[in-house]
Amino acid sequence: MPVLASIWAQDQRGVLGTGTGMLWNVPADFAHFRRETRGCPVIMGRASWEALGGALPERTNIVITTRHDYVAEGAHVVTSLEESVDLGMRVAEETGAPTVWITGGARVYSDAMDLVQELVVTYLDLDAVAARGRSGRVVHAPQIDPLVWRPDPELTDADWRPVSGDARWRVTTWIRR
């Protein structure tokens, strides 16, 4: 049976982005995201879909929105997280994909925390808000409770990876206890 997992990148303060985009450019992490999610269903909220500007290639894109007349070309549109997970699991089982990925945004990540079995989190050695001199709205990653989650030492970086674009980075894979 496929695994349901979330994947995100966050800065030192847990910032994911602005709600409509990211505050950094780390090409090596983008490549990591592509490798992890390629061939798998990806679930995202409408704002994340719109920030992307279109479907992620080589993936089944599933968009959650409460707008019943919403059209997302190249994606399946559903109206609830539960419906998106059901569809993602069916697609993964039919295609042999090992994982159904939650890919954002902040509300979808938060709502999915009780459902997912894994979290793949890229930690960026960067304070994105300070680096960009930006004020205004930012969104944060969900809190990871160590009583619920443990790092998988086999899938977790012991050290920082080299700087790519704006920051050095490392990945921690969290497994539900």
Residue ranges of model-derived segments:
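Enzymes that bind and transform nitrogen-containing heteroaromatic metabolites
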Residues: 1-177
